[in-house]
């Protein structure tokens, strides 16, 4: 008897599993609140050089600015330069000193802003870009983008640590570590007195949040039977969507970056308390030989699900026999993901897919400008469009399979980026439609990737595998903000890069084995029973098959 038979006895889907999904909803909501926070936290409002001595009379200010600030090619006043000397304007007396000295030129000299900047605070009262003494604009705008890169680099490192440690010490313990660390480091970030302190604490916060990304989904799936994995996986992913829409509301209500950071961090406190009711994975406990604790959780699951318990089939001795077949005699390592042919094939393909999913998703999600809507409306729209994409994923993975769904959603993302290259920047409505379509496809790709990857790896290496894919995915997420700086080389280069990577990931997804209707593999041997697929026809994972 294997674990699937044990789970069938205690109930593979019922009040126990639904309570588990509900208790683990908070981490899924908190993730977008932090991951997409730079949309508001690092927003750059309209700004110009500070010009001491500006006239108090409002009617004269336009003339004053015209005399002191050069214009960009699009006709707007420069945000980063000012004239070395005030310029004489027709029908004005400004700049008469230079005119009397005969210093007027066709192209007057300009210099960088030397006395700081003045910001338009109508939309944001404070961001890290406008923070006093930081001024992350113009020559320092790279540091503003780098803040997001530092954060995702932290997520990358955290994914390695949490993936390995949760396979060794358990999902529940490491989830507690993630909660406490996020709370402490989030509060420290909000209290930052310098950019260096902010960058360090946000990097460490990203490392802590990585625990949520790779622990929550497997902890849910390992208590579910095959039939209900899809619906539960899609349901739990809707909490991410809820977090995106909540971020738009919180960002609209709180315009100061420090208070905003506090608002998205403090919910970790009730999350810590909720872990009292979150069960450890019985699958993991059995692979580690913790029979008594696994037996206790299985009995609790049976009681909540209203299942009669058979003393013979669910006795501690019976569970011990299952554990004997599941127990891991050696601690897992990342090298185990590449030791055997089929697992190596899966791992390499997942690396490419996850990099493409994250790179394109965050490239699109963090760019909310140029769509004809304000930042709050765009964020709300991006969140709302994810709901129908969840329905698309639910139907597609059930009937078309995981592999084709993964490839198709990534292809849709790539086409959305490519089509936007053909649309003029003046066509705001079309740009908005294409961006929303791309967001829907990229979110669908993200949802599918979590479900698909969790089903590909065996229980003994599931967290390690999720840690590897999360690591590479966050590498893609950390590079996405920096790729946006490529617009300095060619305006269309960022979109071309995002779309090209998504297209590569779509092709790679077709090389993965199908997992629809397959039970979760328990051991490496379960995965290795069949060679890697070589055709696009549907191939099920080589485990026991169940019918929909």
Swiss-Prot record:
GO annotation, biological process: alpha-ketoglutarate transport; monoatomic ion transport; prostaglandin transport
InterPro entries documented for this protein: MFS, MFS_dom, MFS_trans_sf, Orgcat_transp/SVOP
Intracellular or extracellular location(s): Basolateral cell membrane; Apical cell membrane; Cell membrane
Region annotated Disordered, chain positions: 522-548
Bilayer topology term: Multi-pass membrane protein
GO cellular component, one term: apical plasma membrane
Gene Ontology MF terms in the entry: alpha-ketoglutarate transmembrane transporter activity; organic anion transmembrane transporter activity; prostaglandin transmembrane transporter activity; sodium-independent organic anion transmembrane transporter activity; transmembrane transporter activity
Annotated TM spans: 21-41, 146-166, 180-200, 204-224, 234-254, 259-279, 346-366, 376-397, 404-423, 432-452, 466-486, 493-513
Catalytic activity: orotate(out) + L-glutamate(in) = orotate(in) + L-glutamate(out); 3',5'-cyclic GMP(in) = 3',5'-cyclic GMP(out); GMP(in) = GMP(out); 2'-deoxyguanosine(in) = 2'-deoxyguanosine(out)
Keywords from the UniProt entry: Cell membrane, Ion transport, Membrane, Transmembrane, Transmembrane helix, Transport
Protein name (database record): Solute carrier family 22 member 7
Organism: Pongo abelii
Underlying gene: SLC22A7
């Amino acid at each position: 008897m294997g674990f699937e038979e044990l789970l069938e006895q205690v109930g593979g889907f019922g009040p126990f599993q639904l309570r588990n999904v509900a208790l683990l909803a908070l981490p899924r909501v908190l993730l977008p609140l932090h991951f997409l926070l730079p949309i508001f936290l690092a927003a750059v409002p309209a700004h110009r050089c500070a010009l001491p001595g500006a006239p108090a009379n409002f009617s004269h200010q336009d003339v004053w600015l015209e005399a002191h600030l050069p214009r960009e090619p699009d006709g707007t006043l420069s945000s980063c330069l000012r004239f070395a000397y005030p310029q004489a304007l027709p029908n004005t007396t400004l700049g008469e000193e230079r005119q009397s000295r005969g210093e007027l030129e066709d192209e007057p000299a300009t210099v960088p802003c030397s006395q700081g900047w003045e910001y338009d605070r109508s939309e944001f009262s404070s961001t890290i870009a406008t923070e006093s003494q930081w001024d992350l604009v113009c020559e320092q705008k790279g540091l503003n983008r780098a803040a997001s890169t530092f954060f995702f680099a932290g997520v990358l490192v955290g994914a390695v640590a949490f993936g390995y440690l949760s396979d060794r010490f358990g999902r529940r313990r490491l989830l507690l570590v993630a909660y406490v660390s996020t709370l402490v480091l989030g509060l420290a970030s909000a209290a930052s007195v310098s950019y260096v302190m902010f960058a360090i604490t946000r990097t460490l916060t990203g490392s802590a949040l990585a625990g949520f990304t790779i622990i929550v989904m497997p902890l849910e799936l390992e208590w579910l039977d095959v039939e209900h994995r899809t619906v539960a996986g899609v349901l739990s992913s809707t909490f991410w969507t809820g977090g995106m829409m909540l971020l738009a509301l919180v960002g609209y209500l709180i315009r100061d970056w420090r208070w905003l950071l506090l608002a998205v961090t403090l919910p970790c406190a009730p999350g810590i308390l909720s872990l009292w009711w979150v069960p450890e994975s019985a699958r993991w406990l059995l692979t580690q030989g913790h029979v008594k604790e696994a037996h206790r959780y299985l009995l609790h699951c049976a009681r909540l699900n209203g299942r009669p318990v058979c003393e013979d089939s669910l006795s501690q001795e019976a569970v011990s026999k299952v554990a004997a077949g599941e127990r891991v005699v050696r601690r897992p390592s990342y090298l185990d993901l590449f030791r055997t042919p089929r697992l190596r094939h899966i791992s390499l393909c997942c690396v490419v897919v996850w990099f493409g999913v994250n790179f394109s998703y965050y490239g699109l999600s963090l760019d909310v400008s140029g769509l004809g809507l304000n930042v709050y409306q765009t964020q709300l729209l991006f969140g709302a469009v994810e709901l129908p994409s969840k329905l698309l994923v639910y139907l597609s993975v059930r009937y078309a399979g995981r592999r084709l769904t993964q490839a198709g959603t990534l292809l849709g993302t790539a086409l959305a980026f490519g089509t936007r290259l053909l649309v003029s920047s003046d066509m705001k409505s079309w740009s908005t439609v294409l961006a929303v379509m791309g967001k829907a496809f990229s979110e669908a790709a993200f949802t599918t990737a979590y479900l698909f990857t969790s089903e590909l790896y065996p229980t003994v290496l599931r967290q390690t595998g999720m840690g590897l894919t999360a690591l590479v995915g966050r590498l893609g997420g950390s590079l996405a903000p920096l790729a946006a700086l490529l617009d300095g080389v060619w305006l269309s280069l960022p979109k071309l890069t995002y779309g090209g990577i998504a297209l590569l990931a779509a092709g790679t997804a077709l090389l993965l084995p199908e997992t629809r209707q397959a039970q979760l593999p328990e051991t490496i041997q379960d995965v290795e029973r069949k060679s890697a697929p070589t055709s696009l026809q549907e191939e099920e994972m080589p485990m026991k098959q169940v019918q929909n």
